[in-house]
Amino acid sequence: MVTQTNPVPVTYPTDAYIPTYLPDDKVSNLADLKKLIEMDSRLDLYLTRRRLDTSINLPTNTKTKDHPPNKEMLRIYVYNTTESSPRSDSGTPADSGKTTWTLRIEGKLLHESANGKHPFSEFLEGVAVDFKRLKPLGMGKKRKRDSSLSLPLNLQQPEYNDQDSTMGDNDNGEDEDSAEAESREEIVDALEWNYDENNVVEFDGIDIKRQGKDNLRCSITIQLRGVDGGKVQYSPNLATLIGMQTGSVNDAVYSIYKYILINNLFVTEQTEAQDGSNDAEDSSNENNNKNGAGDDDGVEGSTPKDKPELGEVKLDSLLQKVLDTNAAHLPLMNVVQTVNKLVSPLPPIILDYTIDLSKDTTYGATTLDVDVSHILHQPQPQPNLQKEEETDAEDTAKLREITKLALQLNSSAQKYQFFHELSLHPRETLTHYLWSSKQNELVLQGDQYFNEDAARTSDIYSNNNNDRSLMGNISLLYSQGRL
């Protein structure tokens, strides 16, 4: 059967076919085009060979990096300085009404070179400081424990319970005191700074200056920049399995996958056969043990178990605890999708600090080291990306021009072949040209060339004895979509 096929698309301009009868001296730069096609074929052969070598060697090269990149640590200092405080250790006389203090929050990158200095604001997304103070107790408000302490209760208790009861009373009193203190705290002042990409400000520290003569508690909240999912916090059960509190989602998925491989938890034909034999032995043992049991017990013992399918993962006790499920087996894709529910964004850093006015400065008393490798090692936009895009656009325009020139060359080759044949055999060439033009006209006209009477009086039905002719006509109708 004759079927119509689509022409093979030309992927590259150099894939164009150059007729052998074209003379090099008549077509300009034809020799250069042949050299270009030959060089292109060599380049394709080399790239194919290198691609095969890479595909063969890549699976065997599973060795990870021996020396991971060093962690970049940011040290955060929180301290206060005091001026004109009568309780300071400077020994100079001061006026209590003019006592001022300054709270400073600054950060420095450890092991930082002088050339590549990073300001503290580069690592921050926002900073909030809440100053808290205890509310004064009301005159009629009394503590519950005071009334109980004022009554001498002489209760006789066993000797071995005296110590325990005393410790319990003290603990309850401390809990009540802490809960009462937290409930009495009120925010007397607050300060907040957030990063604004339209108004970028660089600084190495934040100074907050206030006037006061009493110690003051404050809560400092620091939100680091770069919390975009590259580094997340794991759930407690997932952190127990992986051995790290934070990391990426890809690391968590890879760790679970390695745990499944090491413990042979994939359901394969071999493991399924082993499980089937173990189940058969267990069922036979149960039947032997329950040989004299009643009918109801026999029905319960013969209930078939839900067996896992091929490609699923058998969940042991640790995986069931990590994934928070009671299922005995799950598909691998469900295990991967469940990992997204076990991670959360990195929480902000919260520090409780007390401004101490008894010292001139508390520098170095409160420090915190934070890993900022995920912020410094983020991929930066390439400065030459725009130039590369412009170069790609120029290359695309040149490829289009080469394609157009190749089409013009093929058209000129057909004209050259026609006139060359016409100069050698003019009569035969013109006769063949008229016949091919007539055939093309019939093809273009299609059904318009034939009318109904001509189709009825045609001898196509009288020559039905010729099977080859009949099959050819049917194939032609099928190829044109007319049947």
From Swiss-Prot:
TM helices/strands, residue ranges: none
Record GO terms (molecular function): structural molecule activity
Protein keywords: Chromatin regulator, Nucleus, Transcription, Transcription regulation
Gene Ontology CC, one term: nucleus
Acidic residues compositional bias, start-end: 171-180
Compartments (UniProt record): Nucleus
Keyword Coiled coil: no
Record's compositionally biased regions (Low complexity): 148-158
InterPro entries: SWIB_MDM2_dom_sf
Residue ranges, annotated region (Disordered): 142-183, 273-309
Main location: nucleus
One example of a Gene Ontology biological process annotation: chromatin remodeling
Misc. comment: Present with 2470 molecules/cell in log phase SD medium.
Protein family per UniProt: To yeast SNF12.
Function: Component of the chromatin structure-remodeling complex (RSC), which is involved in transcription regulation and nucleosome positioning. RSC is responsible for the transfer of a histone octamer from a nucleosome core particle to naked DNA. The reaction requires ATP and involves an activated RSC-nucleosome intermediate. Remodeling reaction also involves DNA translocation, DNA twist and conformational change.
Subunit structure of this chain's protein: Interacts directly with RSC8. Component of the two forms of the RSC complex composed of at least either RSC1 or RSC2, and ARP7, ARP9, LDB7, NPL6, RSC3, RSC30, RSC4, RSC58, RSC6, RSC8, RSC9, SFH1, STH1, HTL1 and probably RTT102. The complexes interact with histone and histone variant components of centromeric chromatin.
Protein name, per record: Chromatin structure-remodeling complex protein RSC6
Organism: Saccharomyces cerevisiae (strain ATCC 204508 / S288c) (Baker's yeast)
